[in-house]
């Protein structure tokens, strides 16, 4: 076990990730904290398209199935206040109460009542970082930023959710959009009369238009 109980509580779901390299050489890729590197990133000079799915947080249910006690942990909401904020514990507790009110205003999280958790993890693990990136580019970049949010809740075509998370769940999970953009091992093509096919056409049109025309 490489992850500690505290890591699990902090939603660190992999022991691997970018590491600041201690020696500055020609081959060095991460000489300082990514937050600092982003302020002078060459990517700010080019147009980008960035986005995600509506229920990215479904991915985190895999962890909850293994550790359901995390949903009743007293620090569930406190642990989702960004750890890098330089604020007092009293302020953190205040923010944690606001998170509870936002995602579970009239109930408590549980395996049967996990939708609030899914939305909180979608925001905390994925959309919060996307939002900060979009705002940062708007403040310091003259290049354009195109943002997409994909919500295609299919019973049969959201392959990542069905095969990797839970076939009984609904929503558009992390990586579900790949089935609409690329062919895969299922060799499955939805019928032209379905909303899945219309979603496929729309996504391919959006991405190819960006590649060809830059908008």
Curated annotation (Swiss-Prot):
InterPro entries: AB_hydrolase_fold, CarbesteraseB
Reaction equation(s) it catalyzes: a carboxylic ester + H2O = an alcohol + a carboxylate + H(+)
Listed GO MF terms: carboxylesterase activity
Gene3D superfamilies for this protein: alpha/beta hydrolase
E.C. number(s) listed in UniProt: 3.1.1.1
Segments passing through the bilayer: none
Pfam families: COesterase
Keywords: Glycoprotein, Hydrolase, Serine esterase
More details: There are two such esterases: A and B. Alleles of both A and B are known.
Function: Overproduction of nonspecific esterases is a common mechanism of resistance to organophosphate insecticides.
Family named by the database record: Belongs to the type-B carboxylesterase/lipase family.
Protein name: Esterase B2
Organism of derivation: Culex pipiens (House mosquito)
UniProt lineage: Eukaryota, Metazoa, Ecdysozoa, Arthropoda, Hexapoda
């Amino acid at each position: 076990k490489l992850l500690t109980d505290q890591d699990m509580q902090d939603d660190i779901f992999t022991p691997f990730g970018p590491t600041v390299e201690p020696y500055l050489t020609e081959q060095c890729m991460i000489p300082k904290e990514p937050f600092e590197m982003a302020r002078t990133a060459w990517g700010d000079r080019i147009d980008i398209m960035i986005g995600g799915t509506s229920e990215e947080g479904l991915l985190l249910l895999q962890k909850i199935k293994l550790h359901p006690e995390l949903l009743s942990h007293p620090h569930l909401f406190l642990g989702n206040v960004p750890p890098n904020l330089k604020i007092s514990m009293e302020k953190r507790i205040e923010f944690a109460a606001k998170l509870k009110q936002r995602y579970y205003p009239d109930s408590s999280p549980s395996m049967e009542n996990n939708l609030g958790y899914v939305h909180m993890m979608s925001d905390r693990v994925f959309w919060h970082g996307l939002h900060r990136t979009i705002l940062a580019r708007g403040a310091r970049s003259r290049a354009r930023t195109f943002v997409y949010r994909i919500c295609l809740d299919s019973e049969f075509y959201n392959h990542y959710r069905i095969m990797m998370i839970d076939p009984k769940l609904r929503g558009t999970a992390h990586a579900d959009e790949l089935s609409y953009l690329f062919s895969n091992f299922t060799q499955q093509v939805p019928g032209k009369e379905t909303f899945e096919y219309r979603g496929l056409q729309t996504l391919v049109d959006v991405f190819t238009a960006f590649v060809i025309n830059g908008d």
